[in-house]
């Protein structure tokens, strides 16, 4: 068992004077969504990240190297670190111990004054007080000054004054809390995998820190994972490229600071065609990119072109590579730490600090240029790969023009098979990608033509994992999708131009249907990933069975549901079961009622919880290495629904 308290630690003047107070907690319980995004399962897990982020802040400041997260019985969460321990002396303005102020006053914390932490994570600094306000119970133990201090709270209200409960030779903080079921009405049960994925990501992003996750809810089956990466994001890139063929053995790695901005970049090219670029600012995944990404891309393109021309690999200036060309087959991670990050964009996941662009550009270009001149063989391979990508880009240009839709209102350029909806408001519009023309006919007849568009897809689309953009854009089904969506593709992609905010994959419930679904998801992940990140991609859930008893009809979506229904129904009158092999077997009314009607249907939203897992899965299922795919199928066949 790991204990995350520290034996010896420098407390470095981290005291009550550095805890600033901005405002009270009154609004948090009334409008929790404003502070944690939602009160769904996602918001529940966000509580854990707020506490863990405070421990990470201690680590970033150099005072902690062990963090432990435990899911206890009844879904209590315990987070322990071996930092300096939250200050316990009296905070001057409030006249209360600093630890109590941090846990009861909104935006009170070392991260706001500049004197406590140079850099802090904590998504926009919501803080421990919000977790306290939204918890049925919370308790804190502080190991500091050779003393253990303790205080407990209910719904954010202290139950007694901070008290001394023992002596200790360690330093650090332990926080235990149980989310309030009155607030989190959807669920208060934590998902181990969700916590595990983010904890692994945090361990990659903060090299040298050991983060342990343990699940003690089942005494007989305690689960534990511990993550510690001395290589940091360099190890992250190696893991992402695990199923690929790297062009150079070691990732190119830089870790430097300039103007109080810490820049860490790892990059490795592989023989594939897809670009995999992940960016972070203060441990927050910046899905929408930002100035750190801009600076990196600008430097990469400039340096590769300069090297290609000066080394005569590229013959003339007109052979210049575009940014997209230079990133083909690239896996890269950019992580910056900034004292005052400015987040913008639709989901507040785009870095806006203009000064970061120049710092990243300068630091990366100097390092990358040196790498190319010191490794001429690797440099030649990378430049030649870019030249091949440029040729494919030129070939793809005409095909790309064909897919371009001028605006959401531009009907003339729409594909012929598309039955569009009449509404021009993307927020309420949805498009169903339907397997086969016959099912397409039924869905066109059964839809709500005001908000629902139908695009039938004939046969299997191209496996984009094994193809360059020019070949991809020559695939008729892919071209029709790109045109219909209106967003463009790859480097031209613009989420703001999306014609539909729901893209629903609707395939048969058989092996072919699953394959088509995987091909479509691979395409979206590799070339239209922002659609997934924005939550626009869904999978329809057509029924598997129709059970008829007299005049009563029941539509059933899985075997478990069928068994339950059969056990509940009276044996008389006699009932019959029909299994649907395909969407085409249902008439328009049945499709509407079971699969398309927003009042009754079930849709699965496609989420990107774990970039590592997603990337490796697509590479394994759709890539060139047959052995990995065979192993995956053998390992997971037991979980599959087999229909003989």
From Swiss-Prot:
Task: State where it is primarily located.
Answer: cytoplasm
Q: Where is this site: Interaction with DNA?
A: 460, 463
The entry sums up its family as follows:
Belongs to the type II topoisomerase GyrB family.
Output the InterPro entries linked to this UniProt entry.
DNA_gyrase_B_C, GyrB, HATPase_C_sf, Ribosomal_Su5_D2-typ_SF, Ribsml_uS5_D2-typ_fold_subgr, Topo_IIA, Topo_IIA-like_dom_sf, Topo_IIA_B
Enzymatic reactions: ATP-dependent breakage, passage and rejoining of double-stranded DNA
| Enzyme class per UniProt | isomerase
- Residues bound to Mg(2+) 2 are 508, 510
**Origin superkingdom:** Bacteria
Write down the EC number.
5.6.2.2
What does this protein's record comment on cofactor binding?
Answer: Binds two Mg(2+) per subunit. The magnesium ions form salt bridges with both the protein and the DNA. Can also accept other divalent metal cations, such as Mn(2+) or Ca(2+).
Where is this protein found?
Cytoplasm
Q: Does the keyword Nucleotide-binding apply?
A: yes
Q: Which residues bind Mg(2+) 1?
A: 435, 508
Taxonomic lineage is:
Bacteria, Bacillati, Bacillota, Bacilli, Bacillales
In the record, biological process GO terms are: DNA topological change; DNA-templated DNA replication
- Report the GO molecular function annotations: ATP binding; DNA binding; DNA negative supercoiling activity; metal ion binding
Name-wise, this protein is: DNA gyrase subunit B
Any Pfam family matching the protein: DNA_gyraseB
- Required cofactors, per record? Mg(2+); Mn(2+); Ca(2+)
Domain Toprim, by residue range, is 429-543
General remark? Few gyrases are as efficient as E.coli at forming negative supercoils. Not all organisms have 2 type II topoisomerases; in organisms with a single type II topoisomerase this enzyme also has to decatenate newly replicated chromosomes.
């Amino acid at each position: 068992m790991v204990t995350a308290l520290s034996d010896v630690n420098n407390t470095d003047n981290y005291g009550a004077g550095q805890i600033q107070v901005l405002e009270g907690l009154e609004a948090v319980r009334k409008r929790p969504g404003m502070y944690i995004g939602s009160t769904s399962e996602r918001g529940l897990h966000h509580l854990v990240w707020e506490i863990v982020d405070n421990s990470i802040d201690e680590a970033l400041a150099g005072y902690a190297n062990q963090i432990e997260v435990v899911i206890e019985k009844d879904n209590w969460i315990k987070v322990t670190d071996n930092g300096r321990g939250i200050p316990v002396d009296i905070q001057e303005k409030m006249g209360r111990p600093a630890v109590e102020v941090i846990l009861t006053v909104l935006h009170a914390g070392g991260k706001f004054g500049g004197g406590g932490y140079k850099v802090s994570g904590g998504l926009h600094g919501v803080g421990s007080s919000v977790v306290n306000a939204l918890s049925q119970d919370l308790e804190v133990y502080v190991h500091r000054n050779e003393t253990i201090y303790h205080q407990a709270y209910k719904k954010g209200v202290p139950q007694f004054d901070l008290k001394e409960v023992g002596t200790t030779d360690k330093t650090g903080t332990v926080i235990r809390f149980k989310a309030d079921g009155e607030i989190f009405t959807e669920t208060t049960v934590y998902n181990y995998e969700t916590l595990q994925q983010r904890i692994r990501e945090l361990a990659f992003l903060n090299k040298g820190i050991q983060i342990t996750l343990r699940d003690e809810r089942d005494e007989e089956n305690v689960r534990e994972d511990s993550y510690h990466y001395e290589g940091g994001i360099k190890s992250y890139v190696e893991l992402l490229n695990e199923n690929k063929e790297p062009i150079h053995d070691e990732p190119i790695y830089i870790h430097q600071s300039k103007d109080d901005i810490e820049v860490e970049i790892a990059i490795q090219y592989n023989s594939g065609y897809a670009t995999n670029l992940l960016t972070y600012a203060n441990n927050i995944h910046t899905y929408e990119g930002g100035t750190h990404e801009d600076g990196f891309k600008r430097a990469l393109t400039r340096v590769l072109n300069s090297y290609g021309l000066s080394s005569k690999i590229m013959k003339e200036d007109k052979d210049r590579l575009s940014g997209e060309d230079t990133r083909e087959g690239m896996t890269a991670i950019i992580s910056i730490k900034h004292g005052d990050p400015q987040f913008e964009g639709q989901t507040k996941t785009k870095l806006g600090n203009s000064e970061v662009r120049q710092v990243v550009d300068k630091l990366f270009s100097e390092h990358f240029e040196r790498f190319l001149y010191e490794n001429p063989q690797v440099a030649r391979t990378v430049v030649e790969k870019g030249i091949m990508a440029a040729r494919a880009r030129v070939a793809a240009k005409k095909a790309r023009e064909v897919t371009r839709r001028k605006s959401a209102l531009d009907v003339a350029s729409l594909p012929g098979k598309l039955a569009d909806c009449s509404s021009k408001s993307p927020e309420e519009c949805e498009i169903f990608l339907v397997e086969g023309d016959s099912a397409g006919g039924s869905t066109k007849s059964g839809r709500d033509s005001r908000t629902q568009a139908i695009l039938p897809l004939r046969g299997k689309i191209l496996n984009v994992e094994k193809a360059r953009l020019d070949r991809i854009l020559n695939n008729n089904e892919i071209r029709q999708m790109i045109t219909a969506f209106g967003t463009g593709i790859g480097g031209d992609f613009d989420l703001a131009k999306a014609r539909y905010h729901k893209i629903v994959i609707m395939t048969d419930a058989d092996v072919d249907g699953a394959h088509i679904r995987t091909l479509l998801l691979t395409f979206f992940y590799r070339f239209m990933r922002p659609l997934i990140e924005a939550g626009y991609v869904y999978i329809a859930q057509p029924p598997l069975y129709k059970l008829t008893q007299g005049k009563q009809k029941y539509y059933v979506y899985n075997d478990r549901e069928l068994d339950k229904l059969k056990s509940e129904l009276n044996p008389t009158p006699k009932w019959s079961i029909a299994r649907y092999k395909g969407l085409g077997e249902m008439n328009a009314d049945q499709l509407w009622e079971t699969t398309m009607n927003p009042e009754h249907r079930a849709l699965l939203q496609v989420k990107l919880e774990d970039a590592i897992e997603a990337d490796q899965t697509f590479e394994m299922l759709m890539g060139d290495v047959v052995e990995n795919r065979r192993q995956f199928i053998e390992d997971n066949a037991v979980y599959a629904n087999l229909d003989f």
